[in-house]
């Protein structure tokens, strides 16, 4: 690990990408200005995940009926562009895309 810093996941995906970009710049400048001293990551602490599939963006009837509002809010806001947007398949088979979400 060459640079690590905590950040908030508040806001929409574009806000989070903006913070990641700023942290990436900050980390790059820090590494260029100082000798690089890395810290070996513990394999047990590593997190692995597969590439997302479009089917993972579906909001099911079960989720709508059983999940709290903050779960649905977070799922939709994390699946805004450029990711495959959250969607719901209606009884008639039509797909309803969620392009964004706001809490009022």
Regions found by a protein language model. Give the residues of each.
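Active-site-proximal loop/hinge segments within enzyme catalytic domains
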Residues: 1-104
């Amino acid at each position: 690990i060459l640079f690590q810093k905590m950040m908030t996941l508040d806001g929409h995906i574009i806000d989070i990408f903006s913070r990641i970009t700023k942290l990436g710049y900050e980390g790059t400048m820090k590494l260029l200005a100082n000798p690089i001293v890395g810290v070996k990551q513990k394999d047990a602490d590593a997190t692995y995940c597969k590439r997302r599939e479009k089917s993972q963006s579906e909001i099911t009837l079960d989720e709508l009926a059983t999940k709290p509002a903050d779960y649905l809010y977070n799922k939709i806001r994390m699946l805004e562009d450029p990711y495959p947007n959250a969607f719901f398949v209606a009884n008639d088979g039509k797909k309803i895309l969620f392009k964004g979400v706001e809490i009022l």
